[in-house]
Amino acid sequence: MAPKIFIDGEHGTTGLQIRTRMAGRRDVELLSIPEAERRNAAMREDMLNSADIAMLCLPDDASKEAVQMVSANNNVRVIDTSTAFRVNPGWAYGFAEMDKEQAEKIASARFVSNPGCYPTGAIGLIRPLRAAGILPDGYPVTVNAVSGYSGGGKQMIAQMENPDHPDAITAPHFLYGLPLTHKHVPEMTVHGLLDRAPIFSPSVGKFAQGMIVQVPLHLDDLAEGTTMESIHAALVAHYAGQEIVTVVPLSDSKALARVNAVELEGKDTMKLFVFGTPGGSQVNLVALLDNLGKGASGAAVQNMDLMLAS
């Protein structure tokens, strides 16, 4: 019998993307409730407890409520896409390529917290350098990023696409998170193995899906003898054998005139680049992904598949 999957919040941006990725699959059975009943707590609780895996695509408080609904039912496993549990040590962090053991941790976990879109890129760049001893304690990490506006959910999509919206956004590109207290900073710090929080400057562009995350570094402040080439080698070694996260060869990066934020739109992969001048004193690390792909729904389905295969 096919395992039962319930997407709680299936009518939101992330939930709809998960349903699209699972359309036509015969190896799972999707449980569903009508959109009009999405706030029916009794019906939600029944569906949650009927599932083998519940995928929560909800705001933080609603996710916490849903977890309470299944806490006594050990037959239900949970993938949560909110920020509620991403630094909770009782939950497996759902970035399978984060280190060599992470995929197995996800596969065997009852509770999996899906990573945020920005942290997926930032951690993907930072953690390998911390693990390799290249990025020292106390380094003042800066993360700059631009996301497609779909990351803001239905409200921001309406603001960006409907010029008659009462709070329409007409800017082609804008910064936000200006007080430097973005909700993704804690998971960047914890899962990036950082001993101090990074300065994180997020922004949104006038494109629906796509993301660029940048981490600029001064080589003189890294481990002695660090070069652009040794950083690239550390990333290559960390992701050896991976298909979803790939490191672009230095020669290919050098040939680029620009990085297109929407290159991976609709894909569930991530590309990592190392830019700089050979022999120079600075490098810029770049992660390219779809904010709704590897940054959200694609990762959730990947985690589901790992859990089902265990």
Curated annotation (Swiss-Prot):
Its EC number is 1.2.1.38. CDD domains: AGPR_2_C, AGPR_2_N. GO terms for cellular component: cytoplasm. GO terms for biological process: L-arginine biosynthetic process. GO terms for molecular function: N-acetyl-gamma-glutamyl-phosphate reductase activity; NAD binding. It comes from Rhizobium etli (strain ATCC 51251 / DSM 11541 / JCM 21823 / NBRC 15573 / CFN 42). Pathway: Amino-acid biosynthesis; L-arginine biosynthesis; N(2)-acetyl-L-ornithine from L-glutamate: step 3/4. It is found in: Cytoplasm. This is N-acetyl-gamma-glutamyl-phosphate reductase.
